[in-house]
Curated annotation (Swiss-Prot):
Reactions this protein catalyses: IMP + L-aspartate + GTP = N(6)-(1,2-dicarboxyethyl)-AMP + GDP + phosphate + 2 H(+)
UniProt-recorded name of the protein: Adenylosuccinate synthetase
Oligomeric form and interacting partners: Homodimer.
Organism: Pelodictyon phaeoclathratiforme (strain DSM 5477 / BU-1)
Pfam families: Adenylsucc_synt
PANTHER family for this protein: ADENYLOSUCCINATE SYNTHETASE (PTHR11846:SF0)
Enzyme class: ligase
GO biological process entries: 'de novo' AMP biosynthetic process; IMP metabolic process
EC number: 6.3.4.4
HAMAP family, sorted: Adenylosucc_synth
Gene: purA
Amino acid sequence: MESKKFRTPSQSATVIVGTQFGDEGKGKLVDYLSDKYDIVVRYQGGANAGHTICFDNKTVVLHLIPSGIFHKGCVCVIGNGVVIDPAALLDEIRKVEELGYEVTGRLFISHNAHLIMPYHKLLDSLHESAQGDQKIGTTGRGIGPSYEDKFARKGIRVVDLLNPEVLKEKLRENLAAKNKLFKNIYEKEEIDVETMVREYEDFDKIIDPYVTNTQLYLNRQLQEGKTVLLEGAQGCLLDVDHGTYPYVTSSNPTSGGASTGSGIAPNYIGKVIGVCKAYMTRVGNGAFPTELLDETGERLGKIGHEFGATTGRKRRCGWIDLVALRYSLTINGVTEIALTKLDVLDTFEEIRICTSYMLDGKEIHDFPTDHQTLSRVTPLYTTLKGWMASNAHARSFSEMQPEAQNYVTFLEDELQVQVTFISVGPGREETVFR
């Protein structure tokens, strides 16, 4: 009897994850790789994350639409794990079209993605203000409250925009509860239901061309041999399950979140590329063992232009932390590393690398994810000689300064993962592939 032949998943999906506290430079890598993939997918987060892309003497920041939209042969998908501010999305679509790029037919939005409504943003700012010294440091974009409604099974989804009667009923239900909070807890004016219904009554016509069942679309495209690049927002150390809780985001930026946030079956995922800066930054509150509260930290921030792409907030800066990186590489199953912003270190005579921590008089090599313990550790450093010159001309590893090569090799030896992508400047072409 002849044996049957069944389809075997191709593992032609690649995930890009941030391995630090976000802002690692994922946008540049996605932009660089997008012309090598058929589809680029955003799988979690919302407009709280900005991906900065530099090309053709332009600098563009995208918050929701994947960076691949600037590669004309690439299809872009906003997955079910993303929370979407409809007004922000339409503004972004207009911005991309004004730059001369077609969006209709190239952008698909999951019908199951949840929406950020105006009351989510108001709740976000009111709740954050009420926290006093215990603030998380949210962006105030309504991300957390939208995810809260999602998991409380009260959320409004993209598909609801296409049915005005369903949308109206869900808005009434949500505002009945939210207005009690505004009036009785926060002593704010209630939001008028009918006004909000009118605000969203035309969204069905505008957004309908982009909406589809992206879970089925993506899996079918993979079955047909197409390649998919999945881009996360934020970073592993901000993951709600695996990060420095409670100073985390409300979603899963880790590689596991790529599957749940897109609907792509896990066995289609082949490579996981972990993106990390050559130093480290963090926005908002929370433990940061290698933070530099001195002139060196200020210098890193100034050279690296470390201000949030979404909020404009100043980022806290410090040396690279290999204890945290080892943890991130492990839980994400990272197969290769993309090292960004190496050029920021070009003028430092010495570069310090955290290789372990001291905790209660003992050296430890494992990253503590509970905030109380992490806030008590002291970093232990190895110091390397700086290269004191630019690598912007380099297009191969051998063309880089010897001390810069030594820095990269040291990271590889410590982390036991190859660095395959090195950003030596902000431009698309200022990149070394190995």
